[in-house]
Amino acid sequence: MSETSSNSPASGSKEAVPKSLAGSTSNIPNELFVGPDGRPLSQNAQGASKSSSKVVPQALVPEDDIRAVEGILNYGGSNDNRPVSHTHTFVELQKSHQNHLTENDRNFGTSRLDDVAPNADGVRRLRTSGSSTGLSNAPPSANVSKASSNLSLASLAKTQPERATPEVCVPLNPDTGSVPLIHPEQTDRGLPYAPDEKFHNSGSLKLPKGASLEDLSRSPSRAVLNEDGNVDECAPPEPWENEYNEVLDDVENAVVGTSPLEYTSKPLAANRQRSTADLTESDNICGLTAGKSDPVTDVDESQTIDEQSIPEAEKGFYTKDGEGTAGLPFDIVSNLDIPNENAHESSRSKKKHTGPSLSSASQPSAASSSSSSEPSNLDKINDVKKNIEVSANEPQPRPVKEDVPKSQVGGETDTTDVINNSTPKEETEESPSTELPETGKEQPPNKAEPAVPTEASSTKPSEAAEESTPRFSVRPNKFTGSRAGFVAALESRLQKGPLMRSFVPNKSKSPSGTKSPASGETSEAGVKETETTTSSESALPDARKSRARGPVRRPPTSVNTKPSFSVSGIDVFLNLPQSSVMKKKGVETRKEVEPKEEAVIPEEDVEVEVETEEQ
């Protein structure tokens, strides 16, 4: 090649490759000029190309290779035929929710791949970027001169090129079937293809040479003269533009002093006024009157507002949790007490709990909690079941007669409902019975199956804690529990709507009384403190929080808000397979079944021990 380069005159190469062509190709980095035989030639040595009439710039990499590589990238090179136009690349799938963006605005020259996998695009870009002059869109079989590459899989050659997706995101004009030229002004239209524009975006057009100041002051649709002095075609003024122009003209005239604007100190005619006073229910759409249909009294200026006073909480349309209620004012829907729902405790129930019972009952739980951590999942399930049965069987106003059977039921009932309805006198009666399990530790309590006394006793104290503390072992589904109670709550709400309570989340992160003995005492103390503070705070609504500011978000969920009964995948994964392995080895399996010394239902325990003996 070096010899030929020395022989061939510089002029010859200039004739062969006109500047315009070379320029048009320049943005494809690895592109060379290819002679008629299909071999790449360097710019200097073009002796061979003189014989050919025209020199066509072509990609260095033959198109079949590009197609093959692209196919392998997109479809993993599999050999079966795919309808190429309908198969989405994984990249297209990635981006598919944004397709309308990519195709329509500002990105016309850019392939979809660019934002997702900028480098993956290198090969593909060769085909269509800049000048597609030499790269034929004809089916590869038509170019006989090119040898098809060894790379390409036969299945990937595009048999129907017109149906193949164009690689660059300029969509075809459906009418012409051609790639439209795109003028920069049109880029921001939201159109799927670039139309011939009769109406230009007059904002982005260049001004004609003779433009005068008044032309500039007109609204965008006023006629602008083009260089010939003729009026440009442009979109007819839209109705708002006319109004706008009239107003502008009025203002300009008023400034000049030609015609004064009519001006009165009177605001609007009474019938056109929208006053605060006479809003009716029909105005309530979109929360305009925020639930008040009664006229708002005018401000009396003689009254001073004393700074200490706390404004009455405004009624708004949003529930504490931020769902919009369907147009019902706050005091009907605000914070319903749904029976058995104890996730967020009201200040009322907290006040009820602080009493002699709390201090007395918390001690045993703290002492014995070393032996027991939270009752096992099975226990919790039973809890839920009993809860549901109990609450379904009982009429809403609950008699206090429950205190007696509690020892048989095993204290599984959700006690807070009882406590809420009972008076402090009854609470003091409860506290001795709560301490019972501690004193009678060795005797098997009367459960249905007293098979394993130690375990039953280890379950007891945590129940005692449950009775005395505002923490609940089980949070059943929001609407579980007596339906009647729910309706009753609704109806009582309808008669006397309480003001909105500002919601104070429970400060103690750990469920109290269940942790290790050391943490048990501290958490009890903490609970007492928070209870006293919250009861004093929530008596008066906080002035800052009482304004209704649209949907209030619920505070971030803390440990005690989460349902305490949940099986995570990891628990299952860790416990079950391990236990089976241990069984095979013949090792005692009790540890596996009961990893944290949790309480286990007696029947199951017996079965497990039997199994180990057999093996």
UniProtKB/Swiss-Prot annotation:
Which intervals carry biased composition (Basic and acidic residues)?
312-323, 586-599
Its Gene Ontology biological processes?
Answer: actin filament organization
Q: Which residues carry this modification: Phosphothreonine?
A: T276, T297, T514
**Residue list for modification Phosphoserine:** S149, S152, S219, S275, S516
Q: Does the keyword Phosphoprotein apply?
A: yes
Q: Where is the composition biased (Polar residues)?
A: 1-11, 41-55, 128-140, 272-283, 505-522
- Per the record, the domain of life is Eukaryota
Region of interest: Disordered:
1-61, 97-149, 181-217, 266-481, 493-565, 586-615
The residue ranges flagged as biased composition, category Acidic residues, are: 600-615
- Ranges annotated as biased composition (Low complexity): 356-376
**Keywords assigned by UniProt?**
Phosphoprotein
Any one GO cellular component localisation term in the record: cytosol
Q: Where is the signal peptide?
A: none
Specify the protein name: Uncharacterized serine-rich protein C18E5.07
